[in-house]
Amino acid sequence: MAQVVWTWRALADLTAIRDYIGQFSPLAAQRMALRLKTAADSLAEYPERGRLATATLRELVVVPPYVIRYYVADGLVHIVRIRHAARL
């Protein structure tokens, strides 16, 4: 099983998403953050699950419209960004 590593930028994206949704519903923000984190962490079991976005970067659509971008190297899954699909 691979290990999942979060970049500081991906963690900042997760925080920004949670903060934005939290303006409207703190409970929904907490649930969305948990769903995104759980989906990213699940890549430890199936790292090739996401579609290829570039030659090395993969992406996993979690909860439309959010996309987790990551790459796999040396037994590690590097979570690079979590973006709204309109901002890709």
Swiss-Prot record:
Keywords: Toxin-antitoxin system. Disruption phenotype: No visible phenotype when deleted singly or as the relBE2 operon. The keyword Chaperone does not apply. It holds the Pfam family ParE_toxin. The keyword Transcription regulation does not apply. InterPro entries: RelE/ParE_toxin (IPR007712), RelE/ParE_toxin_dom_sf (IPR035093), TA_system_RelE-like_toxin (IPR051803). Belongs to the RelE toxin family. Toxic component of a type II toxin-antitoxin (TA) system. Its toxic effect is neutralized by coexpression with cognate antitoxin RelB2 but no other ParD or RelB antitoxin. This is Toxin RelE2. The lineage of its organism: Bacteria, Pseudomonadati, Pseudomonadota, Alphaproteobacteria, Caulobacterales. The gene is relE2.
